[in-house]
Amino acid sequence: MQESSTPLNQEVSSSRRNWLKNTALAGVAALAAPVIDASAKSAAPAPAARRIPLAVSTYSYWHFEEKKYPIEKVIEDAARLGFDGVEILHRQMTDESIPYMNKLKRLAFDNGLSLPMLSIHQSFVQPKAEDRKKDVAHTIRCINLAVQMGIPAIRMNTGSWRTVKRDAAYYKDGKEPAIQGYTDQDAIKWCIDSYGECLVAAEKAGVVLAIENHWGLSSNIDYLLEIYKPLSSSPAMGMNVDTGNFVGNPYPQFERLAPYATIVQAKTYYGGGFFYDLDLDYQKVADILRKANFKGYISLEMEGKENPATAVPKSLELFRKVFS
């Protein structure tokens, strides 16, 4: 007996016909498609290596002399020379007015330059809580300045006991005894607590606080990492590694810090250093940064006595050679 053709059977039959039709078309398309040789895939060009961006700090033109060198001129010079950005030293700013900060931001934008970091000073190595609070407030104020200028990072210090004179002997060993009645471990705790307060504001503002090996307590790399690591889970915590601020052989210490680096300040000393003189092997520095897969800014701090008009271009030429 022949079964009647039900709607379900008709639907199944139609589905089979469509499936067979689609399968046949797919087969034809597969036959018509070009054959790709496996060797052709492997021969595809590798992506071009990304060039590390180079900035110049306004500090390169002004080493705390009485008369400030205008930041506007640094921005214009940086654009002419071919830098990618300008790091602003807070103490070099004429004032903190909104019109002045907007002027710097617009000038950098018009010249195709970024402003990657605002370098500020503070010390949390102070026994009195009220003194540390003042520097926390100063840091938070500077976070707001960075936001106004569109700057994504702030250079941070730990501070120091200030129990020894900053002379040639100090820069050789970096040793500084604690104030009587206190220890370096006390200072480390003060730094962690103070940074924690600052990070609350930094996270809200979207500004990175980049702790630097900037003498004082941070001359000891173990201490620096002891402060950094408990705070590193914060999205606003970073590290600024300065090539010229190491005691003794810089390269093993630089290698320890390179994996944590958010930004790097690279010093040159043409004409002899203002405070001390180092002969840094920048090819070795570049190799360490490549090994650490560093991709951030390298900011020139020309700290030599030679005229910046000649020393800054020399430094840029050196950096282009080793970091490109």
Segments and roles (model prediction):
Residues A24-A33, L107-S114, V125-G238:
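Active-site acidic/histidine proton-transfer and metal-coordination neighborhood
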Residues P70-K73, Y100-K103, R132-T139, I192, ...:
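Charged helix-capping and loop-helix junction motifs
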Residues V56, A78, V86, A108, ...:
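Conserved, mostly hydrophobic/aromatic
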Residues A44-A46, I75, Y100-D110, I140-P152, ...:
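Short amphipathic alpha-helices and their capping/turn segments at secondary-structure boundaries
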Residues Q2-P34, S39-A55, W62-L81, S218-S324:
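Histidine-acidic metal/acid-base catalytic patches
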Residues A46-Y61, M117-S123, A168-K175:
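N-terminal small/glycine-rich loop or linker at the start of catalytic domains
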Residues E87-K105, W161, K165:
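Glycine-rich, proline-tolerant flexible connector loops at the mouths of alpha/beta enzymes
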Residues V56-S60, I88-Q92, M117-Q122, M156-T158, ...:
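A cross-domain feature marking catalytic cores of carbohydrate-active enzymes
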